[in-house]
Every structure is written in C-alpha cells, then in structure tokens.
Swiss-Prot record:
Species the sequence originates in: Canis lupus familiaris
Its biological purpose: Subunit of the oligosaccharyl transferase (OST) complex that catalyzes the initial transfer of a defined glycan (Glc(3)Man(9)GlcNAc(2) in eukaryotes) from the lipid carrier dolichol-pyrophosphate to an asparagine residue within an Asn-X-Ser/Thr consensus motif in nascent polypeptide chains, the first step in protein N-glycosylation. N-glycosylation occurs cotranslationally and the complex associates with the Sec61 complex at the channel-forming translocon complex that mediates protein translocation across the endoplasmic reticulum (ER). All subunits are required for a maximal enzyme activity.
Keyword check for tRNA processing: no
Name of the protein in question: Dolichyl-diphosphooligosaccharide--protein glycosyltransferase subunit TMEM258
Pathway: Protein modification; protein glycosylation
Amino acid sequence: MELEAMSRYTSPVNPAVFPHLTVVLLAIGMFFTAWFFVYEVTSTKYTRDICKELLISLVASLFMGFGVLFLLLWVGIYV
C-alpha cells in the first residue's frame, strides 16, 4: 500500500477544544473528589454506605482521568 494512497488521520476531538474540555472535566472531577472527602469526614461508621463511596470515587476518578488526558493533549504530550 502506497503512503500517498492512505488518508491522513484526523482526531475525533478538535484540538481547539482541548483547553475547554480540560477545565470542565477537571472542575467536575474536583467537585466529586471534594464531595467524597466531605462525605468521608462527616459520616460515622454506622452511616457510611460502601456503594455510595464507590460510586462517588468512580465518577471522580473518571472525570479526573479524562481531564488529565486532555491536559496532556493540550500541552502537546500526545498519548
């Protein structure tokens, strides 16, 4: 297969929106992280719910992970 015959790869996400995605995703992730910490500090061992803890931490880690991914893409570290 010839190199000229191949089509150039284009990103599914426009690089112009990397800064906006970074800020929004990291802000949402930090909100859920703060909520998780406040929940852990203010609840007693009798009122804690493992499902709620896991759900909040999963959502926080997903948003923070994708936020860091777009931060790396924004600064030019293409992963």
